[in-house]
Amino acid sequence: MTKAQRYFMEIKDKRVAFIGTGVSHLELIKLFLSKGIRCVVCDKKTEDEFDELIYEELSAKGCEFSLGEHYLDIIFNCDIVFRTPGMYYNDETITKARKAGVAITSEMETFFDLCPCKIYGVTGSDGKTTTTTLISEMLKAEGKRVHIGGNIGKALLPIVETMSDSDVAVVELSSFQLISMRQSPNVAAITNITPNHLNVHGTMEEYIGAKANLIAHQNGYSRTVLNEDNEETIKLADLVRGMLLTFSLKHPVQTGAYLNDDGMLCYTEKGRTTEIVHKDDIRIPGIHNVANYLTAIAAVWGEVSIQSIVQVAKNFGGVEHRIEFVREIDGVKWYNDSIATSPTRVIAGLNSFNQKLIVIAGGYDKKIPFEPLAEPVNKNVKILILLGATADKIEKAVTESPLYPESGLKIVRVKTLEEAVLTAQKMAEKGDVVTLSPACASFDLYPNFEARGRHFKRLVNEL
């Protein structure tokens, strides 16, 4: 009997609540219902607001519902609660339920408990989706059967029973998922740690602690990849219990991957260095993507051949919404970098181009500082188009820089993304590059960065 089979047998008579019916939870609920388990959907939407088709489908399978203002009250009468990453682990009601003896878990936590195969886990403030995808692509190129999930891809728990021990799971994990994790992956990679999501975590200490949970439960055979160029990340080296690997864009490392002075990505261990691929042969632009490749190389080294790594480097075209080329109109190139929800990611995007840009920025206020944007924007941006709740803060940070008076930077304020795109088109000249690089989350205008990116692409394609 597999761990998954035993798990479902043991909870057969339990009452299980699911907070929210997002894509991952919907498949999970269907799985649990198919096992004959009593399920309750908890959602703050009222019955009138709830998706009618989903309601009818789940009701027909025997699912209960707790909807509206007091949707969480029912969890005190349940045995197990699956929270979504969007439901803060230290939420007052969740905390009370936990103290009352209710088991609080998540799709990823339970997947880690039941997964029969090796798990690669990636987290970080920036670069985690691309790095997760690169690891997955490299393993696929080597002929592995790969399952990608977590914060990207699909829910993995619904397919855990189809996995074998020769498969590989590659998961991206956010701080919201990690804060309650009690297991670590076999291979862990932390791309970087910079201020992010402080509107939820409250303090940088809690945010770093959540990220550190990725490696807090390792054993002696675990592998960890850390960023030597990022102070907060390399501080976590003392927590590593297994093999420590590092990467650097700036200098050679003792064990791990680095970029040498000739532009070659290298791997070094036990005094032996192997050159792998030149940075100019990597299809996706930007020095930050070189860092993502170094992270992935260190993570898969020994499992993947150099030939497979080079194949991915030369052919992988990137992930949607990450400096994604949209189109060229009248000699002006348009890029969608909607994923750039933090200043560090925006700076990385600006450094991907060898010219001054027209940048559309602004959005939801995550209570993070924008001062780091001041110098790069004044140096690398010719026109800054601002919208959203953070427009004032970004403009203040940029204009208070000593570089601003001589930069020639023009700042334009707009109210909508439609207006921003039309303004950029009007002000752009042949040879210009326009990027959507928000530096913020999208919650004030869109449900997520993907919706914002898709809207931007639609607007550009309609020009």
Show which residues each predicted segment covers:
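Residues in the short beta-alpha loop(s) of Rossmann-like NAD(P)-binding domains
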Residues: G22, K45, I152, D229-N230, ...
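Beta-strand->loop->alpha-helix junctions that form or flank phosphate-binding loops
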Residues: V40-K44, G68-E69, S106-E109, R241-N260, ...
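Nucleotide phosphate-binding/pyrophosphate-handling subdomain across enzymes
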Residues: Q5-R15, H25-K35, R145, K279-K382
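Short internal beta-strands
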Residues: R38-K45, T224-E228, I360-A361, N380-A389
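C-terminal helical cap/extension that packs against the catalytic core
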Residues: Y55, L373-G431
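N-terminal leader/targeting and accessory segments in enzymes
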Residues: M1-S106, T110, K396
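Short beta-strand "acidic-cap" motif of Rossmann-like dinucleotide-binding folds
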Residues: C39-D43, I148, V170, T246, ...
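Phosphate-binding loop of NTP-binding sites
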Residues: L31-L33, L72-C78, P85-E228, E232-M243, ...
